[in-house]
Amino acid sequence: MSQPMTLLEIMRSASVIPVIAIDDPDHAVPLARALVAGGIRVLEVTLRTEHGLGAIRAMSQVEGAIVGVGTLTQPEEFAASRDAGAVFGVSPGLTQSLIDAAKSSGLPLLPGVMTPSEVMAAREQGFRQLKLFPAVPAGGVGMLNAIGGPLPDVTFCPTGGISIESAPKFLACKNVACVGGSWLTPKDAIAAGDWAHITELAKAAAALRAA
């Protein structure tokens, strides 16, 4: 059996991680297939709707998909998400109870931070991969470049307010492995079952790393 990917390996394998909210469980599998077909394999399925865990369970069965759980805010969500098939977790912030849950569940956690002090506090707890959130209100590219000076060993996935147009500037930062974004999964396209459009969005996002 091969070793599971580390969180850093997962981040580096992606240019963009789509932030997904599933309103209809029937959309989960075709959405995952459409994204993977476009070259986007790492998927963050949030717990913002009641269908989150079910979607993780279904999407993790799609060949080529690397499925994580997003919007982790409660300790009990870690083990439940792991059992559903998530191989990494993402939280909007970091608390001691979430740290404890991540350790006990074994689910690699990408916690959200917004300030240099929060970066340093997470770093003291052993985290070297962090989510700058919300990225644009937090200072965007300028903040990332500034943090990279005193804290060069931290790697980020900025999320929040990023678009296909602004993503290349973030990806050009030395301390950015990937970005998170919701533009790959527009609600109108999902509702219409326009999976071909989502595949095209995924292809454009996957090409950002090679650009």
Segments from the language model and where they lie:
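Glycine-rich beta-to-alpha transition loops that act as phosphate-gripper elements at the mouths
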Residues: A21-D23, V69-P75, S91-T95, P111-P116, ...
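Short secondary-structure capping/turn micro-motifs that flank functional sites
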Residues: E50-G52, P75-E76, S97-L98, S117-V119, ...
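Glycine-enriched alpha-helix->loop->beta-strand junction motifs that scaffold or abut catalytic
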Residues: G39-R41, V62-A65, D83-G89, K103-L110, ...
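Glycine-rich phosphate-binding active-site loops on the catalytic face of alpha/beta enzymes
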Residues: F88-A101, K131-V141, K174-H197
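Short beta-strand segments at enzyme active-site cores
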Residues: L43-L47, G68-V69, S91, G112, ...
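Alpha/beta catalytic cores of nucleotide-metabolism and tRNA/nucleoside-modifying enzymes
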Residues: M1, D23, M114-M120, E124, ...
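Histidine/lysine/aspartate-rich catalytic loop segments that bind and position anionic ligands
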Residues: T95-Q129, F133-A138
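Conserved N-terminal beta1-alpha1 strand-loop-helix module at the mouth
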Residues: M1-V87, S104, I164-E165, A172, ...
